[in-house]
Amino acid sequence: MAFAKALIQAPSVTPDAGQALDVVADALKAAGYHVERLVFSTAGVPVDNLYARIGTASPNLCFAGHVDVVPPGDAASWRHGPFSGAVEDGVLYGRGAVDMKGAVAAFLAAALAYGAPAQGSLSFLITGDEEGPSIDGTAKVVDWLAAKGEVIDHCIVGEPTNPNALGDMVKIGRRGSLSGLITVEGRQGHVAYPHLADNPVPRLVRLLTALTAAPLDNGSAHFPPSNLEVISVDVGNTAYNVIPGAATAKFNVRYNDLYSLESLMAEIARRLDTAGEPYVLTFRDGASESFLTAPGPFVETVLDAVADVTGQRPQMSTTGGTSDARFIKSLCPVVEFGLVGQTMHMVNEATPVADLTALTAIYERLIARYFATFAA
């Protein structure tokens, strides 16, 4: 609880998370962790990150999270100040309480209570660039870890995975995300003289019909069906008597493990080609692959730890948006479990203190079960 309040009271609107990282670093240094602050500034804005470890042997269990937060909006709209860390009627208020300073605080408390593993290591990967472009955060830290030969055996990410109550859901994977732009060129002209123009809109409509006529798939063992949404159609035309010279459509696909990034791109192009219309297709940078940590000893360890405290075995899920787990998957198996996500990014973001206490207990059980299983 003390860590959660201290983190909330350290304003850290992305990417300015240095004060909140200081809270984590100071606590870990005092407990004997070797702490490294990693600053990257590819995008021109310095971003502070942290990697800390106690122990030198395997297995290395890592907790990954972020202490940057989205802007609070109008502070006057909050029941308590967004960075107050106020507690009222057993509820902790503040930006980041759920997403995800609460989980960072809970694992920090759990790890310090456990101490140094007799065999193996505990580590923390905490970023200040998850709510922003995610360029100079976890992705760069993962590259840095790989370059120095740092081995992480398993990772738990503290995203707010539970839809309704603590213990509902553990994320064992995430869908991939791909965004694209379709451009159709025409020739601008007067609507009264269509023979002198070339309207691109009907051709774009035919292309979009071909793209969306059939489902991409029917889902897989652990993933729902892939889903393509057309999110914008634009012609840049406000007049009623002008045929536009070009038309564009933007789309996003959330896709499962039946596709790789390359095979999905090929399928999109194949569908568009069936329309028989000329088009230009471009894909936006920043696409991510789907990933899955298959059920096995690590996933079971997490599920058992949750059940130990809540009395219920959580659902394994791959729903929702992307997270920094998409970067960590290249290092090791990764699973996500944190608080209830109902108020994340909202005015009056809050979590019951009882949930924080229970999450800390879950993380304590997870650490104990992990080393009993993997360090034996």
Swiss-Prot record:
Q: Which cofactor does it need?
A: Zn(2+); Co(2+)
The biological processes this protein is annotated with in GO are: diaminopimelate biosynthetic process; L-arginine biosynthetic process; lysine biosynthetic process via diaminopimelate
Which residues are named in the active-site annotation? Answer: D68, E130 (proton acceptor)
InterPro entries from the xrefs?
Answer: Bact_exopeptidase_dim_dom (IPR036264), DapE_proteobac (IPR005941), Peptidase_M20 (IPR002933), Peptidase_M20_dimer (IPR011650), Peptidase_M20A (IPR050072)
Binding of Zn(2+) 2 occurs at D99, E131, H345
* Keywords annotated in UniProt: Amino-acid biosynthesis, Cobalt, Diaminopimelate biosynthesis, Hydrolase, Lysine biosynthesis, Metal-binding, Zinc
Q: Which reaction does it catalyse?
A: N-succinyl-(2S,6S)-2,6-diaminopimelate + H2O = (2S,6S)-2,6-diaminopimelate + succinate
What is the recorded function of this protein according to its Swiss-Prot or TrEMBL entry?
A: Catalyzes the hydrolysis of N-succinyl-L,L-diaminopimelic acid (SDAP), forming succinate and LL-2,6-diaminopimelate (DAP), an intermediate involved in the bacterial biosynthesis of lysine and meso-diaminopimelic acid, an essential component of bacterial cell walls.
HAMAP family for the chain: DapE (MF_01690)
The similarity comment for this entry is: Belongs to the peptidase M20A family. DapE subfamily.
Q: How does it assemble?
A: Homodimer.
Q: What is this protein called?
A: Succinyl-diaminopimelate desuccinylase
Lineage of the organism = Bacteria, Pseudomonadati, Pseudomonadota, Alphaproteobacteria, Hyphomicrobiales
Q: What gene is this protein a product of?
A: dapE
